[in-house]
């Protein structure tokens, strides 16, 4: 249909040019070559379109059923909050690198040191590293001599028995303790930081003016990716809350300005 339209249009155009232009009209050979090029372009376009349709049909016919996209369940978790694990032995390590957090560790042995770039001075470690503990104490004493003190005292440790947590939607989920991958299972460890005590000094946080402020040390949480399950199914990576810092919470005393 498009080829016939090109021929009719060019014949009409040629008739107009023949009436209005004498010496400046297009030569016969150039007009014929233009018609041929347009016809060839139209044929090539139709051929490519047909090939694309054939390729798409062949791909859909060979696509495995397991790879067919499924409609999300109504009321299910958002994609950003939940990433399923299809095969524990093939996808686990790849997704762990993708969602990696220094506070979450998959290992076949209990870690003995804090994650890289984290301070050693508040780390509650294993007796195996007793010499490092004494070194940290000497370092802390050296800081005290310089007059440097923390508003709140915190401690950090690897949690080895975490069984449940609250995810980003506020739902209770089960934290996978042991994951079977290949020959040796691995466990999931969480590096958490919390306050040693709510009031390091008599009136609250250290260094706060207690005449005008009420103060208290509180453990703060943040979200990390972890392998969890919900209702003993839907195993995957979710955002869960863990303890990550100790902060001083202030409130102004009544009647003070």
Curated annotation (Swiss-Prot):
Q: Does the keyword Zinc apply?
A: no
Keyword hit for Secreted: yes
| Superkingdom of the source species | Eukaryota
Chief place of localization: secreted
**Which tissues carry this protein?**
Brain and peripheral tissues.
Region spans: Disordered: 61-81
UniProt GO BP: cell surface receptor protein tyrosine kinase signaling pathway; cell-cell signaling; induction of positive chemotaxis; modulation of chemical synaptic transmission; negative regulation of neuron apoptotic process; nerve development; nerve growth factor signaling pathway; nervous system development
Residues carrying sugar: 131
Please list which residues make up the signal peptide.
Answer: 1-18
Check the record and name the Pfam families matching this protein. Answer: NGF, NTF3_N
Into which family does the record put it? Belongs to the NGF-beta family.
Q: What is this protein called?
A: Neurotrophin-3
Organism equals Homo sapiens (Human)
């Amino acid at each position: 249909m498009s080829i016939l339209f090109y021929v009719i249009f060019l014949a009409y155009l040629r008739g107009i040019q023949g009436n209005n232009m004498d010496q400046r009209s297009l030569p016969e050979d150039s007009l014929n070559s233009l018609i041929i090029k347009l016809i060839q372009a139209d044929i090539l376009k139709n051929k490519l379109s047909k090939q694309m349709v054939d390729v798409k049909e062949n791909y859909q016919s060979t696509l495995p059923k397991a790879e067919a996209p499924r409609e999300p369940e109504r009321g299910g978790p958002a994609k950003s909050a939940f990433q399923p694990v299809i095969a524990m032995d093939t996808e686990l390590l790849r997704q762990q690198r993708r969602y990696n957090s220094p506070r979450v560790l998959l290992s076949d042995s209990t870690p003995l040191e804090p994650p890289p770039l984290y301070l050693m001075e508040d780390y509650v470690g294993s007796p195996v590293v007793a010499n490092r503990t004494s070194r940290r104490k000497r370092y802390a004493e050296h800081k005290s001599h310089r007059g440097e003190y923390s508003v709140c005292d915190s401690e950090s440790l690897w949690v080895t028995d975490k069984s449940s947590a609250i995810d980003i939607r506020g739902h209770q989920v089960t934290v996978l303790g042991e994951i079977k991958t290949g020959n040796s299972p691995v466990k999931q460890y969480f590096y958490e930081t919390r306050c040693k005590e709510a009031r390091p000094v008599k009136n609250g946080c250290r260094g706060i003016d207690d005449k005008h402020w009420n103060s208290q040390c509180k453990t703060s949480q943040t979200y990390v990716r972890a392998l969890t399950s919900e209702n003993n199914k839907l195993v995957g990576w979710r955002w869960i809350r863990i303890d990550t810092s100790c902060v001083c919470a202030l409130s102004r005393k009544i009647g003070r300005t």
